[in-house]
Curated annotation (Swiss-Prot):
Family (UniProt): Belongs to the universal ribosomal protein uL29 family.
GO cellular-component term (any): cytosolic large ribosomal subunit
One GO MF term attached to the UniProt entry: structural constituent of ribosome
Keywords of this entry: Ribonucleoprotein, Ribosomal protein
First and last residue of the signal peptide: none
Biological classification of the source: Bacteria, Pseudomonadati, Pseudomonadota, Alphaproteobacteria, Hyphomicrobiales
Any one Gene Ontology BP term: translation
Protein name per UniProt: Large ribosomal subunit protein uL29
Keyword Glycoprotein appears in the UniProt entry: no
Domain of life of the native organism: Bacteria
Family annotation (InterPro entries): Ribosomal_protein_uL29 (IPR050063), Ribosomal_uL29 (IPR001854), Ribosomal_uL29_CS (IPR018254), Ribosomal_uL29_sf (IPR036049)
Length: 66
């Protein structure tokens, strides 16, 4: 997910997307532990998407306060 796409989302949409990604991250970790994971690079992609969403959500919150 690109940063521009994330910036276009509302606060509620950001929370929903974050919850979805965290669930996916959990499932990927579980698949890795059981040896069923096919694309190990997806773990890094999801981790970076989560960080991107958290960063932009924090920036939006700071802008709203200022």
């Amino acid at each position: 997910m690109k940063a521009a796409d994330v910036r276009a989302l509302s606060a509620d949409q950001l929370k929903e997307e974050l919850a979805k990604l965290k669930k996916e991250q959990f499932n990927l970790r579980f698949q890795k532990a059981t040896g069923q994971l096919e694309k190990s690079s997806r773990i890094d992609e999801v981790r970076k998407d989560i960080a991107r969403i958290k960063t932009i959500a924090r920036q939006k919150a700071a802008e709203a306060k200022a």
